[in-house]
């Protein structure tokens, strides 16, 4: 029998959650991570599945995700413990044929359930599937320290925040030319914040929740993690710069335009115009 804990997707989730914990982005049970799979990914592991998979209805139907498997982190689970007991902290779920709910095929032992942010994840997956023609498969939410800090001191405006991050590190415009979407503060774990996040995910692969954290999307676990890591590094630089009295020189608009041309990306126009 093939052991699902040795599969590429379980091992990938272990690495991503462990790395995020070590970064300091996921204290206690903070953060959540979902990866969209294909049936072929789980085909070898049916012997590992629960004999009677639990069914959980969704608060709103997701027909675009019908019959789609995911691996997800659990509600109330600590990222630091995923590596110690993957089956207790992760779960493979599969959305049913009409998108009204899902079965827990593997993991989430002892009656555990997926992350409370699953509505936000699933709604964001739907939008990123449409925005990237199915390329994006990962939604990651974490409490990246310096990005959160900046939401207290910068105007919480997409163009302003994006431009500052682009200026904080040269690679940022290349990595996220589509900029950073920003929500107003909202209660987490609700359909409302999920819908608002998904709306921003139509236009941006990064979405900030002020005073809380960040959502990132990407085609692989490495890409989604790297996207957040890049933005967080720029935020760390900016926190240091602001604490030293602010910028005396920075990357100019003309230089940002040249950077976009060199790497074949189209920068977010509203951020470039500032």
Swiss-Prot record:
Reactions this protein catalyses: L-rhamnulose 1-phosphate = (S)-lactaldehyde + dihydroxyacetone phosphate
First-listed, main subcellular location of the protein, grouped into a coarse class: cytoplasm
EC number per UniProt: 4.1.2.19
Keywords: Cytoplasm, Lyase, Metal-binding, Rhamnose metabolism, Zinc
Cofactor, free-text remark: Binds 1 zinc ion per subunit.
Keyword Metal-binding found: yes
One protein family per Pfam: Aldolase_II
GO molecular function annotation: metal ion binding; rhamnulose-1-phosphate aldolase activity
Active site: 117
Annotated binding of Zn(2+), by residue: 141, 143, 212
Stretches assigned to coiled coil: none
UniProt pathway annotation: Carbohydrate degradation; L-rhamnose degradation; glycerone phosphate from L-rhamnose: step 3/3
GO cellular component, one term: cytosol
Disulfide bond entries: none
Subcellular localization: Cytoplasm
GO terms classed as biological process: pentose catabolic process; rhamnose catabolic process
Keyword Ion transport: no
Domain of life: Bacteria
Known partners and oligomeric status: Homotetramer.
HAMAP family per record: RhaD
Protein family according to the UniProt entry: Belongs to the aldolase class II family. RhaD subfamily.
Protein name: Rhamnulose-1-phosphate aldolase
Gene name per UniProt: rhaD
